[in-house]
Amino acid sequence: MKNRLPAALMTIVGMAFSASVAADVTPMTLRDGRIGYVMTNLFWSVYQTPDAKEECPKGFNDGPREQFEILFPDVENRTVVDTQLAQEIETWHPTTEPDPLPFYDIEGPYSYGLNLDGEVGQNDFTHPDGTQGIDNEVYRAVGCIIGFRGPDGVEVIFQDKAIADRAYNRTMIELSGVDNLENDDSVTVTVYRGMDRLLTDATGMKVMSGGSQRVDLRWGAKLIRQTEGKIVDSVLTTEPIADVVIPWMNLGVPTFQLIRDMRFQLDLSPTNANGLIAGYADVDTYYKQLIRNDSTHHLSNGQISGISLYKALSRLADAYPDPETGRNTAISTALDVKMAQVFIVHPDGEASMPQHTTD
């Protein structure tokens, strides 16, 4: 009997302590008007229905193995140079010549992404929430390739997993000048490269908020970018950044993506920032990142023909025309991104000023 009262008091004290901790979450993570987030997941936004009939009525695209059988039905009578090597050479040195084989673009009306050019064009997508004028031509190119479709597409698995696994891929953002995370009409957003492993739970599989990341000013100084944004109903929207390099190693090969006019649209909380990165991906950089990481062998597992995909990306490119040829060199895109709150550690005495800012 005599032990029940202390036990009850301990329960009440514990509940009060838990409530006070919960109430202090925001002050703990928002320090001097600053809060940082580190990227944990990243992949190209792909709108998909369960049976794919809406967006891919003609079916999925063939990969290297399937195309090889079509192109060389008489392979026994031909040389390796004329068949395997010829295809491999074109994979690594693709052209914009018309594709001799069928390639199926997305035909459905819907896509995730943002309106990048401020216009509603005839070929633009509509967001599932009804927003018109969505620009996402990368989705039009990759949406009917099984390797880019979740949850078990080979690119979905390996490209996304590499973001958390590899310190090389450590991209983070720091918001400064923040009054609160619900509504703020003016905040500064700085993109940094981090240096450290992510904080995870005991399984090592789940990334936790509350870790720390040192700013990489040796190899990452030239990757620092800065822009302005605003927070409305806990959604951060930024102004475009002229160009952003995203380190994206996959399967051990150091590579990156170059996104022009890149902007963030993120749902913010004291522990996470999830949403979209959108802009125009440089076509050649996009392709090099894919083929250098995966090669024909791995791409075949997702029925991804590098030859056909490069032709599609070049054909659908919708921005940054080459001044000499007039050919567009960048293609509109959106990426699903998840970030965990992190405490960003700046080097003592080092001025972490951005190298490039908003246009």
Predicted regions and their residues:
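Residue-level detector of intrinsically disordered terminal segments
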Residues: 9, 14, 204-207
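N-terminal signal peptide c-region/cleavage motif recognized by signal peptidases
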Residues: 17-18
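Extracytosolic secretory-pathway proteins
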Residues: 23-359
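Bacterial N-terminal signal peptides that target proteins for export
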Residues: 1-8
